[in-house]
Swiss-Prot record:
Upper taxonomic lineage: Eukaryota, Metazoa, Chordata, Craniata, Vertebrata
Extent of Polar residues compositional bias: 13-23
Motif (SH3-binding): 95-101
GO CC annotation: nucleus; P-body
Region (Disordered): 1-46
Xref: InterPro entries: PNRC-like_rgn, PNRC1/2
Name the UniProt record assigns to this protein: Proline-rich nuclear receptor coactivator 2 A
Function: Involved in nonsense-mediated mRNA decay (NMD) by acting as a bridge between the mRNA decapping complex and the NMD machinery. May act by targeting the NMD machinery to the P-body and recruiting the decapping machinery to aberrant mRNAs. Required for upf1/rent1 localization to the P-body. Also acts as a nuclear receptor coactivator.
Signal peptide: none
GO BP annotations, alphabetical order: nuclear-transcribed mRNA catabolic process, nonsense-mediated decay
UniProt family annotation: Belongs to the PNRC family. PNRC2 subfamily.
Amino acid sequence: MGGGERFNIPGQHRNNLGKQINRQKLFDRNNQKMNTSHTKDRGRGCGTSLAWQAMQNGINNNAFSPNQNWSAGFPASKNLFTDEDNQNYAGAKFSEPPSPSVLPKPPSHWVLLSCSPAEKELMSFQLKTLLKVQA
């Protein structure tokens, strides 16, 4: 058993659903054919739009003239970054090496307990060398 959930859809609803989908497809096809035939009958496809009429009549819209001074609407570029240049960036500085206190320490299960202090010093030096970023 265990076939999962099943929806009980009576047979009549399935047939009606298929008929509705077929009707919608037929309507969409007929509607597309009617729309294309209307544009062919008019001759010019976009001849009745307001923009087309305005272009034909030679109406000039001064809101978008080509000689408009666009830089007047924007602040001067020299004033954009002057205040930010004087502030210090709080993030990491990659030109300076990190301090040893912020370097990660190896997990305790990596280090044997029988290591001498000299061996621990050597391992920490090797770890710092591996983590050093070369400029």
